[in-house]
Structures are given as C-alpha cells and as structure tokens.
Amino acid sequence: MNYLNKIRIENPLTICYTNDVVKNFTANGLLSIGASPAMSEAPEEAEEFYKVAQGLLINIGTLTAENEQDIIAIAQTANEAGLPIVFDPVAVGASTYRKQFCKLLLKSAKVSVIKGNASEILALIDDTATMKGTDSDANLDAVTIAKKAYATYKTAIVITGKEDVIVQDNKAIVLANGSPLLARVTGAGCLLGGVIAGFLFRETEPDIEALIEAVSVFNIAAEVAAENENCGGPGTFSPLLLDTLYHLNETTYQQRIRIQEVEKYV
C-alpha cells in the first residue's frame, strides 16, 4: 500500500468537479483515505487551486447546458497546470447530448484516466452503443473494450464491474475484488473516481501500480465492510465502507488483493 500510505502522510489536495448527488459522500470518502478534498467548481479560482492540487476528478453525472463550458474550461486549466484529470463519463451512452459533450471534452483537453463501466467506455468508442442510465451490460467484453479505448484516447482506462479492468502502459490487468452492495449505493462508483484522483500525485501519465492500488484499496474495503456483522444492507454498508477505508491495513490488503490476469500486448 505504498500509495495509500503516502496519501495518509501527505494528505494530497484532490479537486472534485462532481455531480450534485454524490458530493458529500465523495468528500467523506476522500477524507477517509487521508486525502484533502475540495469540491471547487469555479473556473475563476481553478488556476490557483490547480497549482497546489495533486489530482482532479471530472464527473458529468449532473451535466447541464449551464455547466458544460465550465467543465471544458477547468479541464484546459488543469492541462496548463500539469494537473492529472480522472474523467468519469457518467451515463455517456444514455443520450446523444452526453455522448457529444464527452467527445468534445476529450478533444478539448487531455485526461490521464477515463473511468467508467463497460457500457460507458464502449459508448466513447462506438457511436451505436446505448445504455440504460448508468447500468452496464454484464455480457460486454471489458478487456477488449478497454484496449480499444486505450488505443483511441491514448490514456489509462479503468472499467468497473463484477471484475475491474485497467489498461495502461500496454498492459491489461483484471482485478476481482469488490462487493455487490457497491451497486446498491448511489455514488459508490463516483467515489472511486475521486479515490483514483487522490492516488495520482500530479502524475499525468500515471503508473499502472497506482491505478491497481487505488481500485484494489476501494474494493477490498467494500468487501470487508460487506462482511462486517453490523452490515445489514446498503444503509449500513455506506458508513462501514468509509470506516474500512480509514482503517485498512497492509495485512488485509495483501491477503485479499486478487489480480486475476495480467496481459502485455503491443
């Protein structure tokens, strides 16, 4: 847990431009791992914030015509400041409007990580792909989709699901931790985007080990929380997840991490 230990010592400032539904949960989750969240949205202050921040999450869950130009502006400011961006294209396949905006953003600015479920990432590379809300199709080949997205956007790809796929540095990693309860809590996936941003430490080309650890820390904490005798369902799972992120130790991490597959390709 080299990266998590560093977070707990250095408390990296992590900026989250995220959706209205999840701001509180995201901020509390970042505090639980030791990061310092700031839910700053004003382009007017971005330049000052981004000089000292370590990572930026852009999550378009509550995208509107009023905020789309602000999102592009802060992404471009982050590029100018050398601040890595984690982009979460929430429900990108649900509407033409969302898909067009996501593609515009990805043309207007360079992101360091694109994180989403298989349907969302597929929608970024296939104009015919559709989805229902933020739900993903379990039958999609996430590794193939991640590889194609990586080739298209030349950036790290994290696909979440029953198994999680990370593609970076011409490597494909499959991780097998997590809990079904994550799908029963609004904002769990959005929090993972913030956690990944907290692990970047201003690395615009993130090391794949940082991404593996970020996803594994989050999902192992979810497993432990779900197994807690006091966990009766989604309502008790959420605070237990925060507690477990706060207390997670090296022994538990090493005992539980499941890297199911490592693939190198050109």
UniProtKB/Swiss-Prot annotation:
Family as reported in the entry's similarity comment: Belongs to the Thz kinase family.
HAMAP family with a match to the protein in the record: Thz_kinase
Domain of life (superkingdom): Bacteria
Coiled coil: none
Gene name of the encoded protein: thiM
Gene3D superfamilies: 3.40.1190.20
Residues involved in substrate binding: 39, 187
Catalytic function, reaction form: 5-(2-hydroxyethyl)-4-methylthiazole + ATP = 4-methyl-5-(2-phosphooxyethyl)-thiazole + ADP + H(+)
Name the record gives this protein: Hydroxyethylthiazole kinase
Cofactor: Mg(2+)
Enzyme class: transferase
Transmembrane segments: none
E.C. designation(s): 2.7.1.50
Source species taxonomy: Bacteria, Bacillati, Bacillota, Bacilli, Bacillales
GO biological process: thiamine biosynthetic process; thiamine diphosphate biosynthetic process
Biological or metabolic pathway of the protein: Cofactor biosynthesis; thiamine diphosphate biosynthesis; 4-methyl-5-(2-phosphoethyl)-thiazole from 5-(2-hydroxyethyl)-4-methylthiazole: step 1/1
